């Protein structure tokens, strides 16, 4: 099987390696989501808050992801932007039950969407409205309105409801991200 994998990679039929940056406020579920995307045998049993960043690898049908899981505490947020220039996609995770920090979420998300290395390159941004299992969580439509996303015209973004603990919604969101990244890579070839 190793020979066939090598042969398919040689002829460009293997999985394409891509870098993504995973950002969001502290306690939004970034690391738990990435843990769900790994194979069952490589998942961590205990999730601890990220300090700085951690690289997590996982694959979809066509892409092999190197995900830079960025810490969400205020003192680390300024480091996010240094990873955008070498990425082909961004995942922004938010806690859909955290109504108190919605204005802060809006500010941070718009900084990402408008960042020169995101907006000018047209890299896709997938927003994961996590913790939808919590009673009183906002819907994607409510979050879109609260964050003013309907006013944001540049770039490619989408929003998806997820639950990191169960994995609900992650397959659909990752299919969307994979599709958008493949489109992005095709436009870069020409």
From Swiss-Prot:
**GO terms under cellular component:** axoneme; cytoplasm; cytosol; dendrite
Q: Which residues bind GTP?
A: 24-31, 50, 69-73, 130-133, 164
Q: Which residues form a coiled coil?
A: none
Q: Which CDD domains match?
A: Arl6
Q: What UniProt keywords apply to this chain's record, in alphabetical order?
A: Cytoplasm, GTP-binding, Lipoprotein, Magnesium, Metal-binding, Myristate, Nucleotide-binding
Record: residues binding Mg(2+): 31, 50
Q: What's the short name of a Pfam family annotated to this entry?
A: Arf
Q: Which domain of life is it from?
A: Eukaryota
Under the heading InterPro entries, the entry gives: Arl6, P-loop_NTPase, Small_GTP-bd, Small_GTPase_ARF, Small_GTPase_ARF/SAR
Lipid-binding residues (covalent, N-myristoyl glycine): 2
Task: Report the record's Gene Ontology biological process terms.
Answer: cilium assembly; intracellular protein transport; protein localization to cilium; vesicle-mediated transport
User: Per UniProt, what is one GO molecular function of this protein?
Assistant: GTP binding
Q: Where in the cell is it found?
A: Cytoplasm
Principal localisation:
cytoplasm
Family statement:
Belongs to the small GTPase superfamily. Arf family.
Q: What is this protein called?
A: ADP-ribosylation factor-like protein 6
State the organism of origin: Caenorhabditis briggsae
| High-level lineage | Eukaryota, Metazoa, Ecdysozoa, Nematoda, Chromadorea
